[in-house]
Every structure is written in C-alpha cells, then in structure tokens.
C-alpha cells in the first residue's frame, strides 16, 4: 500500500538521533501522494546557528541553555509556519523531542543546572499549552549510536567545521529517544529500523513506504 486517503490533514514528526537518517527518509516519504515534508535545515547553516553549535560542543555547560532555548523557539516556529491544509505534514523533529531528548540529555549530563532546566521547562510548557501544540503521530527512526557516529565522521570529512560529536553524547540521546518513544502513550509511534539502507536497497525503500503509509492511514 502506498496511497494515503485523499484530503487527509495530519501533522507528524520524524524523530531520531543526530545523523540517524531522517533527511534521507523524508526525501523518500515526500514521494507518497498527499505527503509534504519539512526539513530541519532552515537555520542550520546560518552563521549564528553554526557558531552556537560550535560553542556548545566546545563548552556544553556554558552554551547548552542558549542552544536549547534557540531550538525550542525554532520548533515552535516550524509548528506554526509549516502546515499545508488537506495534506499529511511531516516535520523533522518537534518541540517534544527538543525537551524529552535533547534538553533532558543536557540536564542528565550536567550541561544545564537546575535553575536553567526549570526555566527551560517553564518556557516549553507555556508554548505547548498556549499554542496547543499536538501531533497525530510520530515516526521514530531507531539507529544505533555507533552508526550515527560513523555517519558523523563521514560528514566531518566533506563538510568544513562539522562539529565533533562524542559517542557518549550520542548514546545519551539514544537512551532518551528510547525512554520517550517506546513508552509514549499520548500519540501513536511507528518505529522504523534506521540500520536499513533505504537509498540503495529497493526492498527496504518499498517496505518503508508501505509501513509509513499504513501507519498514516491508521491514525
């Protein structure tokens, strides 16, 4: 099955670790009829964000709160601006992964202290409550940290100044993804094996499209 009910209006997010393959999957899913995808690239390479990310990985305790606050606002803006009526809208990450994965990981690793965490949560709760931010479903691209690190190392060769992200940080992010999405009760979650080669394996690509299509039609 690769057809979605016509005039379906839904909003989903695709979640996963850094370099888990979300962008490649989104490029494939946008070929499904009635699907429109929004990539997390609008600000990624602006000078301000590149500098903020660089500073975070050099000194996470100093810059974690600033980075998480920036991304919280960015997710809110994506939620408000990236929506096409009567279409299935799939966003790369959400304000919820910003909190339950990245902000919680930063706190667990000691990058944000208790006052910063409290301020972040207060801001996050205000946005989600006042703006009534909700999603119809989540697609979780489950990729082991070692694979993510290998892909990051490859990117660091081709992209100048690509941040050196530690395997320990990736493992913590993976643990937070697992804790959040394997126990999530508020919204349906589809878990996809991120170790599959969706680019060069036609069978894996077809399976991905079928699973996502069936998931969207079921919610």
From Swiss-Prot:
Keyword Magnesium in the entry? The reply is no
The protein's UniProt keywords, in alphabetical order, are: ATP-binding, Kinase, Nucleotide-binding, Transferase
**SUPFAM superfamilies linked to this entry:** P-loop containing nucleoside triphosphate hydrolases (SSF52540)
User: What's its catalytic activity?
Assistant: 2'-deoxycytidine + a ribonucleoside 5'-triphosphate = dCMP + a ribonucleoside 5'-diphosphate + H(+)
Q: Which InterPro entries match?
A: DCK/DGK, Deoxyribonucleoside_kinase, DNK_dom, P-loop_NTPase
Active-site feature positions: 92 (proton acceptor)
Residues noted as binding substrate in the record, renumbered to the chain: 40, 68, 93, 98
Query: What is any Pfam family matched here?
Result: dNK
Any one Gene Ontology molecular-function term assigned to this protein's record: deoxycytidine kinase activity
Specify which residues bind ATP according to the UniProt entry for this protein. Answer: 16-24
Q: What is its EC number?
A: 2.7.1.74
Q: Give the family, as the similarity comment puts it.
A: Belongs to the DCK/DGK family.
* Protein name, as recorded: Probable deoxycytidine kinase FPV059
Task: Output the lineage of the source organism.
Answer: Viruses, Varidnaviria, Bamfordvirae, Nucleocytoviricota, Pokkesviricetes
């Amino acid at each position: 099955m690769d057809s979605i009910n016509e005039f379906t209006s839904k909003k989903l997010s695709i979640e996963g670790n850094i370099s888990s393959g979300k962008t490649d999957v989104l490029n494939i899913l946008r070929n499904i009829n009635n699907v429109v995808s929004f990539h997390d690239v609008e600000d990624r390479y602006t000078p301000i964000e590149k500098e903020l990310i660089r500073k975070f990985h050099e000194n996470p305790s100093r810059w974690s709160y600033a980075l998480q606050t920036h991304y919280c606002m960015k997710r809110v803006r994506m939620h408000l601006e990236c929506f096409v009526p009567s279409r299935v809208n799939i966003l790369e990450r959400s304000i919820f992964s910003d909190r339950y994965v990245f902000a919680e990981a930063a706190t667990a690793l000691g990058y944000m202290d208790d006052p910063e965490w409290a301020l972040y949560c207060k801001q996050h709760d205000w946005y989600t409550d006042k703006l009534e931010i909700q999603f119809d479903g989540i697609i979780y691209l489950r990729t082991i940290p070692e694979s993510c690190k290998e892909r990051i190392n490859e990117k660091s060769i081709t992209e100048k100044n690509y941040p050196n992200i530690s395997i320990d940080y990736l493992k913590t992010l993976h643990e937070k993804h697992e804790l959040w999405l394997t126990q999530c009760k508020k919204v349906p979650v589809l878990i996809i094996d991120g170790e599959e080669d969706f680019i060069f394996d036609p069978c894996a690509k077809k399976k991905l499209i079928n699973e996502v299509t069936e998931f969207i039609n079921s919610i």
